[in-house]
């Protein structure tokens, strides 16, 4: 009996030692969505982003993911119009790190393989020259009809450059400081109804 008690005590002691040496490891991450609400059904041109952008650094590729950013375009028809043109132009695209480093990232915007630049308009629809807008073709067909016409399409967004401190460019994103960058990517849309 004493041997059984001693054996049970030894097994319990070894089991207790194993538990005492093990430590729980936990990790936590937070996902954040931007949230605003707006309704505009009376302006001649309304462009609504259908989501927000979140770029994540991937160690395996030493870079950031790219994202498709969808948008909805609504226009008011003009029965006197004989042609319609829709263009886009990049306004802002800098994300700044939320610490004291001053590190920045520049976001590139592409529409159907063409870069949307700050210095020139990107033609999305130009009915006079046969550019009918791909996924936005409903606008090319409805610009001179009464009422409103809507269509959806998307830009491809990607991180195209970065700095460690606001001035020193990086060629290897793995050298960027750790942290979170924040900012706005704004694209201006211009619509022209020609009568």
UniProtKB/Swiss-Prot annotation:
Primary residence: other
Keywords per UniProt: Fimbrium, Signal
Cellular compartment(s): Fimbrium
Signal peptide range: 1-22
Gene induction: Positively regulated by EcpR.
Transmembrane segments: none
Gene Ontology CC terms: pilus
A Pfam family recorded for this sequence: MatB
Entry's family note: Belongs to the EcpA/MatB fimbrillin family.
Subunit structure: Self-associates. Forms filaments. Interacts with EcpD.
Role played: Part of the ecpRABCDE operon, which encodes the E.coli common pilus (ECP). ECP plays a dual role in early-stage biofilm development and host cell recognition. Major subunit of the fimbria.
Full protein name: Common pilus major fimbrillin subunit EcpA
